[in-house]
């Protein structure tokens, strides 16, 4: 029979693992995937951004949701997952496929899909550990509203090449901010 001290130590380690640990291990390649995604999105540009200055628009990116200092990892991962999911949804539409080079778009969407799988596995891992709340509903709603504004803008601009270029630049910015958040979270580990 194990000593009471040994059992106590096992219980402390297990409880600390579920409550003290961030519980989620993104693959080491995840940061590289983020950078590759940004590079692909940069390559997708078809027209000069300077020719679309009149079409610029403030979509109201929910910056506070990506601050990182206010977040614990589990809710942050859920918000990142929602961001990537919304980007994936935006770039897999019929209107999107008409706007971009098909090969680059396929590679970009494949990278997004891989990131979604990584983040999904992370969210599932958090659920198994029993982390709550897994999702910050207000933050997720802010991300959804942000993408709703982007979609409305594209519709109003009739999915013009300049509208897509403005959206591409906006998504580059949001992906860059999400990459920064992920790196801050990784450093906290």
UniProtKB/Swiss-Prot annotation:
The cross-references to CDD domains, in alphabetical order and at most eight, read: IFab (cd00095)
Q: Where is the signal peptide?
A: 1-23
Biological process (GO) annotations held by this record are: adaptive immune response; B cell activation involved in immune response; cellular response to virus; defense response to virus; humoral immune response; natural killer cell activation involved in immune response; response to exogenous dsRNA; T cell activation involved in immune response
Example GO molecular function: type I interferon receptor binding
Which Pfam family would be a valid example here?
Interferon
| Subcellular location, record wording | Secreted
A Gene Ontology CC term for this entry?
A: extracellular space
User: What InterPro entries does UniProt report for this protein, alphabetically?
Assistant: 4_helix_cytokine-like_core (IPR009079), Interferon_alpha/beta/delta (IPR000471)
Disulfide bridges in this chain: 24-122, 52-162
**Residues that span the membrane, as ranges:** none
What else is on record for this protein? Answer: Interferons alpha-1 and alpha-13 have identical protein sequences.
Instruction: Give the protein family.
Output: Belongs to the alpha/beta interferon family.
State the name under which the record lists this protein. Answer: Interferon alpha-1/13
| Species per Swiss-Prot/TrEMBL record | Homo sapiens
């Amino acid at each position: 029979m194990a000593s009471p001290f040994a059992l106590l130590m096992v219980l402390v380690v297990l409880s600390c693992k579920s409550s003290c640990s961030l519980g989620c291990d993104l693959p080491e390649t995840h940061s590289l995937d983020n950078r590759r995604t940004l590079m692909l999105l940069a390559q997708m540009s078809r027209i000069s951004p300077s020719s679309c200055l009149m079409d610029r628009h403030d979509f109201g990116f929910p910056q506070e949701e990506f601050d990182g200092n206010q977040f614990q990892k589990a809710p942050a991962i859920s918000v990142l997952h929602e961001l990537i999911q919304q980007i994936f949804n935006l770039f897999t539409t019929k209107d999107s496929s008409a706007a971009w080079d098909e090969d680059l778009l396929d590679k970009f969407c494949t990278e997004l899909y891989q990131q979604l799988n990584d983040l999904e596995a992370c969210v599932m891992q958090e659920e198994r550990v029993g982390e709550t709340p897994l999702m910050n509903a207000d933050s997720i709603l802010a991300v959804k509203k942000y993408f709703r504004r982007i979609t409305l803008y594209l519709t109003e601009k009739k999915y013009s090449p300049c509208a897509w270029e403005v959206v591409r630049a906006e998504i580059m910015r949001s992906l860059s901010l999400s990459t920064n958040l992920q790196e801050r979270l990784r450093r906290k580990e």
